[in-house]
Design a protein with these regions (language model features):
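Short histidine-centered beta-strand/loop micro-motifs
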Residues: 3-6, 46-47, 84
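HotDog/MaoC-like acyl-thioester-processing domains
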Residues: 49-53, 61-146
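A conserved, well-ordered hydrophobic junction motif at loop->secondary-structure transitions
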Residues: 1-15, 143-146
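Domain-wide signal for the mature, well-folded portions of proteins, strongly enriched
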Residues: 18-20, 47, 54
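Active-site helix/loop of acyl-thioester processing domains in fatty-acid/polyketide metabolism
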Residues: 11-31
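General structural concept
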Residues: 36-46, 52
Length: 146
């Protein structure tokens, strides 16, 4: 906890990365390796405090070529107030590191209304992500590395 008795954002991201990685392990064929390539739509929506019981949920929402998108959210349950709030959400991109052109991913079968919505909009997010990657390449050209 930080000096305001709120969980450090870095700790939240550490849990997120581990949990998203577990989703990748469950989704991908066992012979494939992957690394975390990036996060987007990352938002801290409400603080996680000492009185909260937090739960991190992650699941795959799309896959294309060598990339797998994983959605993660933190819910915080306040046991005194008996209330649950959405504390954090993010999309994580995992990249398969095996030397393959395209990976044959398992079929995604969304089960809940939330999963159906997020899986349905994957191609839209992928298009935006590819645009952002091009923009980042341009930014990198102008950065000083010492």
């Amino acid at each position: 906890m930080n000096n305001n008795q709120i969980q450090f954002g870095g700790r939240t991201l550490e849990i997120l990365d581990a949990n998203a990685g577990l989703s990748g392990v469950k989704f991908l064929p066992s012979q494939l390796s992957f690394v975390t390539a990036g996060y987007d739509h990352t938002q801290f929506l409400a603080p996680l405090t000492p009185g909260d019981i937090s739960k991190c949920t992650s699941y795959v929402t799309g896959a294309d070529k060598k990339a797998v998108e994983v959605f993660s959210k933190f819910e915080a349950y306040n046991k005194q107030m008996k209330e649950t709030k959405l504390a954090f959400m993010s999309f994580c991109t995992l990249i398969v590191t095996n030397p393959l052109e395209d990976v044959q991913f398992p079929k995604l079968i969304p089960e809940t209304a939330e999963e159906v919505y997020l899986v349905k909009n994957y191609q839209e997010r992928l298009k935006k992500r590819r645009q952002e990657l091009q923009e980042n390449k341009e930014i990198v050209k102008h950065l000083n590395i010492e």
